A protein has these predicted regions:
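N-terminal basic, Ser/Thr-rich segments that initiate or prime the first beta/alpha elements at protein or domain
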Residues: 1-144
Length: 144
């Protein structure tokens, strides 16, 4: 059971859940490929590049598995981080603005950054969210 499921209020249901986009694995994949390519040049260099790539992949995997983005019938609930956890639980009626930032590549592959602004000065930015426009649409759909 995830963070969102374990923190639901009475009579609250999950309407939509999103994840981090698989783009977070690009950097590690490129470094591992460089390591494999370097096998032809130098074994130590190849081992170092592959090791760094695998470490980056492990970090991306932990980030992917430990991040939750959800819209419920009453709130927006977001949790990121494993060791250093950051959470946002914002009542739908307190959401003032939602903005989505996507590059051209982000629009083509379906990822982007989401900025939530709430009453009381809450201003949070979350990067590399899969389908951020759908996430925003679901928040608007529940808020009305």
């Amino acid at each position: 059971m995830g963070y969102i499921e374990s923190n639901l209020l009475p009579d609250e249901q999950i309407v939509y859940k999103a994840n981090l986009h698989w783009k977070i694995f690009w950097k590690s994949s490129i470094v591992v490929l460089v390591g494999i390519f370097c096998l032809a040049i130098h074994a130590i260099l190849a081992g170092a590049a592959t090791g760094i790539g695998l470490a980056l992949a492990l970090r991306a995997f932990i980030d992917y598995k430990s991040s939750e983005f959800g819209v419920t019938t009453k709130r927006v609930i977001i949790k990121v981080g494993f060791i250093r956890r950051r959470t946002l639980e914002l009542l739908l009626r307190q959401v003032e603005a939602i903005s989505v930032d996507q590059s051209m590549l982000g629009r083509m592959l379906g990822f982007g950054s989401l900025t939530l602004t709430g009453t009381g000065g809450v201003h949070e930015v979350f990067h590399n969210i899969s389908s951020p426009l759908e996430f925003r649409r679901r928040i608007h759909g529940q808020a009305t």
